[in-house]
């Protein structure tokens, strides 16, 4: 309801809630900060885990920021923006999701302090934008160029990423797998490398221990051989990939055949058998001894394939067919009649094995495969899931370094360097924007402070020590949470791709700026639920924060 010349004017439907100016900003900032506080305790190698139980009783135990926020049913629109920060970070850099969300929350906390001092949001926004831009320049300056062929550097980055997750006991072993997987699928484009993560398949099976996780230079498919009479092991495999069914095709039109005698029926059945046999004969003729079919295989076709000693697998997913093509060099053929010996792929071994009581097909020993599989094992479903998340992050981190060839020290070192340098930059800018840039610089200290706090150290004392050591010894000094002292993170092998902090600051500052721009929130009333389904009417918009 608005007022014009003393007359109330109703312009919004009944039950609509509206928050204007400072109230709208306070609500949005509070919602975003609650999200940041939720994930803050998971940051760093000593961070804690969260247990999330959904409405069906399914449990997820993780300290991965993106997973936590993805699993939470968040209603508030400003809080949803923070979830987007984590998703963007995960997609672009692969790691640093918690860092991005925590920085965004702290930027908003500092912005709120400035708003309380009557500094206009547009000044804060301008200051934050200048600081974020300068931060990107500083990160490019302090980044170290590395040789992407140096496996030791790649392994250290992978170990840093895995440390603090449930899988950290086997972090050295898992880091080796991550590095080997990325190196195997990396393709050189000009002077740089490109890594398509779709070519790394993660297959999970409960049972065994994390140490039983293995990298297969080929493809593992969660299927079994279609006929008991077929070979379960084929060495020197010649592989055909077919994306049509090995069945008699049905006609497009609804046609009826009137059979008036037993001879006609017999001729009809014989023709069907002949068509299926021709398909199988064609496969045998080109020299294939293993067939992967995207659709079904008729029982009769199965019989003939088994008779010829050809291993066949049916209803293989399209994504798996593409990986098989990448790994073996086979071409996916739509029509069996078009199959030629040149379309076949090769592998040293195709074998059906039992893993955790279930049959799986292993395609191994491919020549320079451009698709690989990581078979993840672990004692429980939760362990397997968390190992998968840890390996996905590690693989993405290694990919970033292979593509960019640049790293920074981790452990809060880049954030401290940025904080110190942005403080100096603020003085150059001057004006009221200086206050916003200083607030941005101060907000970045939340990362080393939280790392110390989560490790049980005194955050203030640790931060003072680290900043002093950082100013004296250089931009690679960070928080060693295991020793509780400042340390050269580069020497300790605690490193990250420069893409991680760059993207974290970009995402966090953009989210903070977007939330600060909002000065009016108009929330329509929720739709009434049907009477037997519980309460109806509108819900309070602010109640989502409670």
Swiss-Prot record:
InterPro entries: Chaperone_TCP-1 (IPR017998), Chaperonin_TCP-1_CS (IPR002194), Cpn60/GroEL/TCP-1 (IPR002423), GroEL-like_apical_dom_sf (IPR027409), GROEL-like_equatorial_sf (IPR027413), TCP-1-like_intermed_sf (IPR027410), TCP-1_chaperonin (IPR053374), thermosome_alpha (IPR054827). Keywords: ATP-binding, Chaperone, Nucleotide-binding. PROSITE patterns: TCP1_1, TCP1_2, TCP1_3. One of its GO terms (molecular function) is ATP-dependent protein folding chaperone. Gene3D superfamilies: GroEL, GroEL-like equatorial domain, TCP-1-like chaperonin intermediate domain. Molecular chaperone; binds unfolded polypeptides in vitro, and has a weak ATPase activity. Forms a Heterooligomeric complex of two stacked eight-membered rings. Belongs to the TCP-1 chaperonin family. This is Thermosome subunit beta. It comes from Thermococcus sp. (strain JCM 11816 / KS-1). The lineage of its organism: Archaea, Methanobacteriati, Methanobacteriota, Thermococci, Thermococcales.
